């Protein structure tokens, strides 16, 4: 039976998160017998909780294609970690309520470890409530620390950016070191992982 899909962005934005959004929207159109519309959550999962859904079918093909080259998070992202099912069943039930209201049968959550955990929890609550929902976590993290994932989209971009920035900073230090500083400290992202450094 044909259902709608819900896509949301989570965590820090990378130069690949919008490309992933474009791919989800375009690929969904290749399955018209299974997926009707793709809704995007305004500001991530908060968009579902607040019922702020963007109907991507109203956007032009040209605009969706432009997402491949657009930085930032076009639909808005969030750092909102849903608590455990035991601690906050109300929020999970709210998600399912919104999904039912918009006939959503597919949930794509684009982010890191917390997003994958949320997709898993939503799949568990949907099963327990008897609601047929396919939940898919889409990896995206510059941290490159997702379990059983070799390389995350986002990591290659940041690795290149940090390498180039370090080279450029070294030229600055080199040109000033005779009469000025000889030390340069570069702090990079990566949370508890050190892949970027």
Language model: regions and residue ranges:
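N-terminal phosphate-binding or glycine-rich loops at protein starts, especially the Walker A/P-loop
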Residues: 1-53
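Glycine-rich oxoanion-binding loops at beta->alpha junctions
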Residues: 51-105, 114-115, 142, 154, ...
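Conserved anion/nucleotide-ligand pocket segment
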Residues: 177-197
């Amino acid at each position: 039976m044909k259902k709608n899909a819900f896509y949301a962005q989570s965590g820090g934005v990378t130069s690949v998160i919008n490309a992933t959004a474009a791919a989800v929207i375009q690929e969904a159109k290749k399955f018209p017998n299974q997926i009707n519309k793709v809704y995007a959550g305004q500001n991530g999962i908060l968009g579902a909780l607040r019922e702020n859904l963007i109907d991507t079918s109203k956007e032009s093909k040209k605009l969706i294609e432009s997402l491949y080259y657009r930085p930032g998070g076009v639909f808005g992202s969030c750092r909102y970690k849903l608590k455990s099912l035991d601690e906050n069943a109300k929020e999970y039930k709210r998600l399912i309520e919104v999904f039912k209201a918009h006939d959503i049968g597919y949930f794509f959550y684009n982010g890191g470890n917390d997003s994958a955990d949320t997709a898993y929890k939503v799949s568990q609550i949907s099963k327990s409530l008897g609601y047929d929902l396919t939940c898919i976590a889409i990896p995206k993290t510059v941290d490159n620390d997702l379990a059983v994932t070799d390389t995350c989209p986002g990591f290659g971009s940041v690795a290149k950016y940090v390498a180039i920035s370090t080279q450029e900073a070294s030229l600055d230090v080199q040109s000033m070191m005779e009469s000025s500083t000889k030390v340069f400290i570069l702090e990079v992202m990566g949370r508890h992982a050190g892949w970027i450094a």
